[in-house]
Amino acid sequence: MFFPLNYIKLSPHRNCLEKYLKKELPKLEGSILDIGSGGRRYDYLLKIKPEAIDTKPNEAKGIKFGDANDLQCKESSFDNILCIEVLEYVKTPQKAISEIFRVLRPAGTLILSVPLMYKTHEDFLRFTADYLKELFSGFSSLEIKPIGNFYTIILDILRGKIAKLKFKPVKYIFYLPYLFLVLFIPLSRLSKDTAYISGYLITAKK
């Protein structure tokens, strides 16, 4: 269901991404490794609690230290791997994808997302569809799904500017027209133009 207020809590890009993840993640069967888990934000969509790793471990949440370029896992040890909005922070993505391929079981599923036209956030890289096809060429099947469109990119920029306003009453005043524009997001999805997108969701099979 479409809730405009969600677009204040999360960016339009994140909302579009989570719309897809809510469809895909509940389908996963078997063991799961969540790379760059952060706060285990997607556990609620999964049937099985994943093994979570991050460069910033969290003992309270059961998140161990892990590096995407050097996964301390045996070969073919997971049925599924999640890597959501992580690869842009990795300096050598080819090495990370090789490691993911190594620890994924035959016929296992990788679900990965990356931003494209999105604000800078201490990331190293951005990925086009053509580069992603080359990067995942070793997988037996690959689906690259665009996230967002021109309209959601503009809303992302507006939301970012409003969030930086320090005087709260003014901030709330600006959020009103922003939320009005958010109401047109479902209509914007009718556009088939993929020249301007905020990112990609990749589903790959080993």
Task: Explain the meaning of each model-derived region.
Residues 25-26, 75, 97, 136:
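A short, aliphatic-rich alpha-helical micro-motif
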Residues 83-86:
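A short beta-strand submotif of the Rossmann-like class I SAM-dependent methyltransferase core
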Residues 102-105:
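Short, cationic motifs built from Arg/Lys/His that form the positively charged side of catalytic pockets
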Residues 91-95, 99, 109-205:
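S-adenosyl-L-methionine-dependent methyltransferase catalytic module, highlighting the catalytic core
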Residues 70, 88, 120:
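Glycine-/small-residue-rich active-site loops that bind phosphorylated ligands and cofactors
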Residues 1-73, 80, 194-200:
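Conserved N-terminal segment of class I S-adenosyl-L-methionine
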